[in-house]
Amino acid sequence: MRSTNNKNIHKTGNLCYTISTFHTEEGTGLEARLNGINRQETLKYLGCPGGPLPKDVLEQLETGEQEILRRAVPRVIWRLFDRGPAGELAGSGFTPAGDDIRYFLKDCDQVILMAATLGMEVENLLRRTQARDMALAVILDAAASAAIENVCDNLCADLAEAFAPRYLTDRFSPGYGDLPISQQEELFRLLDISRRIGISLTESGLMVPQKSVTALIGVSDRPQLRRSRGCAACSMFADCAYRKDGTSCGKP
């Protein structure tokens, strides 16, 4: 884990955010890390079946992944809250809504709110490429999705190490299951996301840059089973605002 002295990391209410490798709060910051793009993740987002790929496709994949790595400026932010008996986050005025999130957090007495983004350079690259080369734009989009997944996975791995011997759940994002996408607004308010790491929120609850993720993570004294994830397993699949916009909430 890339962190400074983490003696205060379990203190609720601390707002911890990083821009690239800059620690903004001594003793609590965890580094925003993009250390690679998983080729299988990129292919998954492209919907490619298994088996060998033509040489020209492999070359495009390599070009696209390297371009995303070059342009990305990862940023992350997170904050810890105690969880009350009714599921409310103490002192926040926010209670995550829906049966799915209540069940997901049922063993947890604390909740981490987090957000991550690849930054506007990646967003602008995707927009420019869509206007001139749609085939390359699709590859770049898939590579960027794999990249933001890497950033989130790295943050979660670092948090798991920092909170040990306690246990963390998977990530659970607004719009996933029956957690309303409208509750993005609460995460933005509590984390001060727009000002801190430069993500804006549209009226429909989608984020710009689009390669951004917000999520809740539970903290428990009990080991947490890894739950089935992904669009196909989501009860909101048919009505998902992310999917209709051609993006996802960032869950694998």
Predicted regions and their residues:
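Short, positively charged and aromatic/hydrophobic N-terminal segments
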Residues: N14-T21
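Conserved mixed alpha/beta catalytic, RNA-binding, or beta-rich assembly cores of soluble enzyme
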Residues: C108-S173
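Short terminal or interdomain "cap/linker" segment that borders an active site or interface and mediates
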Residues: L118, R166-Y242
